[in-house]
Amino acid sequence: MKSSEIRQAFLNYFVQRGHQIVASSSLVPSNDPTLLFTNAGMVQFKDLFLGLETRSYQRAATAQRCVRAGGKHNDLENVGYTARHHTFFEMLGNFSFGDYFKREAIQYAWEFLTEVLHIPAERLWVTVYKEDLEAEDIWLKEMKVSPERFSRCGEKDNFWSMGDTGPCGPCTEIFYDHGPEVAGGPPGSPDEDGDRYIEIWNLVFMQFNRDREGHLHLLPKPSVDTGMGLERLAAVIQGVHSNYEIDSFQYLIKAIAQLGQNIDLNHTSLKVIADHIRSCSFLIVDGVLPSNEGRGYVLRRIIRRAVRHGNKLGLPSPFFFKLVQPLIDVMGDAYPELINSKAHIERILQQEENQFTRTLEQGLRLLQDHIKNLKGQELSGEVAFKLYDTYGFPIDLTADIIREQGLHIDMEAFNQLMQQQREQSQAASQFTTDYHAVSQLDHQSEFHGYEKESMEAKIIGLLQEGNEVKSINKGAKGAVILDHTPFYAESGGQVGDKGLLIGKNCSFQVDDTQKVGQAVVHYGEVIKGELTLDLSIHAQVDHIRRDAIRLNHTATHLLHAALKKIVGQHVQQRGSLVDAERARFDFSHFEALNPQQIQQIEEVVNAQIRANNEVITQVMDIESAKQSGAVALFGEKYSDAVRVLSMGDFSKELCGGTHARRTGDIGLFKIVAEYGIASGIRRIEMVTGRYALAWVNEQLGFMNNLAATLKTTPNSLQEKISQLLLDNKNQEKMIAKLLSEKAQKSGADILGEIEEIKGINLLIKQLEGMDSQTMRHTMDQLKSRIDSAVIILFTIEQNKMNVIAGVSKNIIGKTPSAAQLVRHLCGKGGGRDDMAQGGGNVPEDLNSKIKEIREMIEKI
């Protein structure tokens, strides 16, 4: 039974038992900033378990893509060296949110393993939490599990919690017995660390809530969270002991071996690379790009580890990107996003490998030199840090190499150097706090801005300097909270609205609108009278500004769709700022857009504007929205009910912002800038509507002025400038020829001033009225005509000197270098051993310094 068939059998089994199949969530968690990567099936349901979210279903099943590399859950250093450690794995899981509990969960697990997959019951071992008598009775009395294959374990192994407080509960685990020929004892025994008994399924029963004092309270609706590693299960079904022997891994391993010559299929490096192509490809699919921090740095570490192992196997570089197609062969049916992103993944992997290969050989040589000279078993932290800082070696890559040779690293010294570097970096950065910061508010505002730009409302909260007050007087800055408001609070990249709050004998100018908890907070200044609590006011949004923002926001959606069409489906929005005068859009991409791409994008967006499609908004549940093809933004957290914005069949995105009624309202779209802001992140700045027209007119005005200056017409500008550049190039050639002739004459004139000292031809000469370029030409002429020469030429003007020195290559090492001669004469300068240049104030003892140079030559 193939891995793909096992995955599908699991999902089919639970569909037949009323479970909703939920697609694997991104490897980048959207609901947990403390988590580097999704590392378990329950991550996407965390808010459900915490009671912060509800869904339309109470039973779910998933095949979740997981990564454990970096952070608390880091398997990287063991990958390839053990039978079951991976950076990437699939976790099969079934979940109950207040529906079924222990009995059904246990029955489902046992039935699937023994009746669907036909695993002999006598090869399975079960553990429960020692105080969970209910689960024990279900296993022993109802499932008829033999007491000889059953054990009770303590809290460390069989009690799960989400944190120090919150939902928690006992768990029961199912192990597979690989047989007495494999070392190791049963779970809970002193020999349990062996490989004979391998955990394949963990069933967590969340039935308690732990308070701050550590007391457990029964939850009103207990839940079930289960997880089973597909790779481990496949090893059991396929009768192999190591996960790397299952069908999907073997396909990859053979594909890697084919890239080299005479490679042993059991080589550890093949396992490392096979694992790493999985994690790297799926991380890139989910929007992670190699960088020097956070998730991007973990990806970079994994790629570089794979490249190093490829180097160890003698694979011709670049090789890693060639494994994307074999990965698609085994996983593309289950995860079509791999197929859609194939070219993007290959491009990123090839680019990253090429970049690292340039320093890999140098770093390896440096490391091997230090290993040869080691007097003990420890590599210094300084060497490890140099490999990291100069050659791009992640510390775990260095540790890998060191471990293979039975050595270790002085990690304390390495960590101290890393800390020093972090402190220096932090000292160079200054941050300011947001003046809008306020304490958490209990107030709640109802937003009506989708359908209204003005309305009557009542003041339910007033703030000054972050504190609640009862009134705000004329001239004072503060913030106002209304029970109902048409003002849009900054969110999703769209800036907050501005406008006026007008009451009887008072008014408040709104300069910004933000969301704090459930309250919409209007920041600004009282420009008339006094504002007090419970005052009735008229809220009026600046509709001209709002309309301009609408156009820009709708245009960002068209831009996003156009980028995917022109640049590639790998493009993901990474941020935006939608203001009235202009907007910016950040997106994932690995290189600058070329002029042709920018022009194509503008043409596509403006074509959609001319189509004048209606901008349609629908409210639906998140799963229906995703199934309809709506684009969900990278890393964004969504509630169960979402707004889906559609423009014909060209763009469909989840969005809570305000938008134009039709695409034609935008009028005109222009890209005014495109540049990189971080590794793998590009930014487009754009204008629309009347601001786009103003920008175009500004550019036309500039062209007209330039044409007038050059005495031509705007249509002939390109031809005129090309001719000017050609004329300039010809003049530069003529100047270069004249300089060369002048240098030849100058060189010929001073050849007679050469002194021969011990076989070395020395020339030190002050030149009058000669510029630097001519002086360099003269030096080249002299060096080409004089053998074994030390030549120093200098000019003096307004007490400043310019010096150039040259040393024939056949005497380098016998005489002072050219750079040393320049510094000796004028104190400043640098260059190569055979040619250097410098300058500065004329030294008072210039003649003495010239004499000292002669003495240096005489002493050779």
Swiss-Prot record:
InterPro entries: aa-tRNA-synth_II/BPL/LPL (IPR045864), Ala-tRNA-lgiase_IIc (IPR002318), Ala-tRNA-ligase_IIc_anticod-bd (IPR018162), Ala-tRNA-synth_IIc_core (IPR018165), Ala-tRNA-synth_IIc_N (IPR018164), Ala-tRNA_ligase (IPR050058), Ala_tRNA_ligase_euk/bac (IPR023033), DHHA1_dom (IPR003156). GO terms for biological process: alanyl-tRNA aminoacylation; negative regulation of DNA-templated transcription. It is found in: Cytoplasm. It catalyses: tRNA(Ala) + L-alanine + ATP = L-alanyl-tRNA(Ala) + AMP + diphosphate. Zn(2+) binds at residues 553, 557, 655, 659. Its EC number is 6.1.1.7. Binds 1 zinc ion per subunit. Its cofactor is Zn(2+). It comes from the Bacteria. The keyword ATP-binding applies. PANTHER family: ALANINE--TRNA LIGASE, CYTOPLASMIC, ALANYL-TRNA SYNTHETASE. Belongs to the class-II aminoacyl-tRNA synthetase family. This is Alanine--tRNA ligase. It comes from Legionella pneumophila (strain Paris). The lineage of its organism: Bacteria, Pseudomonadati, Pseudomonadota, Gammaproteobacteria, Legionellales.
